[in-house]
Amino acid sequence: MRRGLLLLNLGTPDNADIRAVKLYLREFLTDKRVIDLPTIPRYILVYCLILPFRSPKSAQAYQSIWTEKGSPLLYHSQNLVTKLQSALKDEYKIALGMRYGTPSITTALAELKDCHSLTILPLFPQYSSAATGSAIEKTLSYLANQEIIPSIKIIRDFYQRPEYIQAQAKIMKPYIKDNFHVLFSYHGIPERHIHKSGCDTLCPQTCTPIYDKNQACYRAQCYQTSLLLAKELQLGTHQYTTAFQSRLGKTPWIKPYTDEIFAELISKGIKNIVVSCPSFVADCLETLEEIGIRAKEQWEKLGGEQFILTPCMNDHPEWIKAIQSIVNEQF
């Protein structure tokens, strides 16, 4: 029997029309780990306030990045599976499961039902309850109802892994020029999620180094990722900035906000930036539309000149090698 490798990601609508996007957002936003309110307030918020207004706007955003091959997140993920399966040969059987949408986690686990062991790899370098935690919970809830449960290994995060850092840096390096400032833009989460992770402080600027109390702190893991990438890329502390994007609603999210950091950079005389999104392993709405289109327009309106968005790792050979190493180390 082969070992099973389950790759997990967030998901994508089936297509870019309003109906498909609304169905996707409904599944996503009613997840109690994403909007961590009691059930009734959460459903009122989602059904009455968010879905009616956000669905058309989100559909328009998806349409701006949709290709003949469909969703970039989906086809990059599928290409990753194909190339990784070729690299790992018969040692593993690999399946892709999306937390929301298709292919579902249930479908992916059904493909791996004959595997005697299962390695679960959420494709989120930094741990968060809303993404990693939700995907793992969904996976384990399905397995809990099976007659035969395989031996299980979970790779909770990999932000500190040298293979990930080196792969990310190699993809970024060709885009970095001498007179460019580097902006690391991570997906944001509400501040309250940081406190719920066990971290008892929310640092006003950068985060403290990783230690026992903040080892599951998403913000601390992001800052550590930036530090490791800067070291690999030989960037000085004045040559890069860390910020957080994609905030939703009026509650405080972790800071600094990507869309507010641009004015600060401009005020310092910075005109040219390279933006990398290290919390995303595959290009998607948040990288291609939010950063590649909207953030670039904002930068130019503020007086910025050159704006370069580096691609995510997608199905890059260095990323394939990194996953091989991370997974094989489990055995």
From Swiss-Prot:
One Gene Ontology cellular component: cytoplasm
Record key words, sorted: Cytoplasm, Heme biosynthesis, Iron, Lyase, Metal-binding, Porphyrin biosynthesis
Keyword Protease annotated: no
Reaction it catalyzes: heme b + 2 H(+) = protoporphyrin IX + Fe(2+)
Residues bound to Fe cation: 187, 286
NCBIfam families linked to this entry: hemH
Known function: Catalyzes the ferrous insertion into protoporphyrin IX.
Name of the protein this chain belongs to: Ferrochelatase
Native organism: Legionella pneumophila (strain Lens)
Gene coding for it: hemH
